[in-house]
Amino acid sequence: LCLDEFHQASPEEVDQSIYTLSNGVSKIRSNQDGSLASRKRWKLLFLSTGEIGLSEMLEKVQRSPKAGQSIRFLEIPVIGKYNAFDDIHGYASGKEFADAINDKIKNNHGSLIQPWVEHLSNIDDLPTYLITNIKELTNRWQFNSKGNQFGYALDRFALLAIAGEMATKIGLLPWDCGDSEKAIFNIVESWIAARGYESDSEDQFLLKQLPKALNKWRNK
């Protein structure tokens, strides 16, 4: 799910929506007769296509992202050789390349969904297949962190890499084997560099507050 024009939403709505989208279940509501309505459920990956991140959004109302929010809505810097791109495939500029992509999308979209779903449906025990491959890939990436939040994010990155590799192998993407994994790994490294640490946010908060606490109590 791509969230466009993210900056036009109110910070208060964004604050709550991050949990709503990621938790995958609607609020408990009642029918007109007072009985409980059935709860809607979903499972999705979502991203913002806007230029503003969650931290900047919440700063408008003097708030900071909670640990749960920051790990559900990852802030990934997009800085390429040509703005958002590293390769503009022969076009004169990043803007010209982006405009060409937008033009192609208008006439070519949805054509891969049927063969993709057919492929997934032919995999025996898809959940086990994904769990096994996600674990193998994250182990191969060899990050040292044991933090639960970092591991949660890494699993989501690995899922995207695996999906890309699967699509490449069955001819749905014109990439070479390993391209998807390499691209996602580069994104992981950018995310870690921008985040500044691999541990859980609460641990980092305590480390930042420790010098302040020591100075405070030393002067008592």
Predicted feature descriptions by range:
Residues 1, 9, 14-31, 45, ...:
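Extended alpha-helical interface modules used as scaffolds for assembling large macromolecular complexes
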Residues 5:
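Catalytic glutamate of the conserved HExxH
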Residues 35-37:
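Helix-rich terminal scaffold detector
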Residues 40-43:
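Short loop/turn elements that form and flank the Walker-type P-loop nucleotide-binding site
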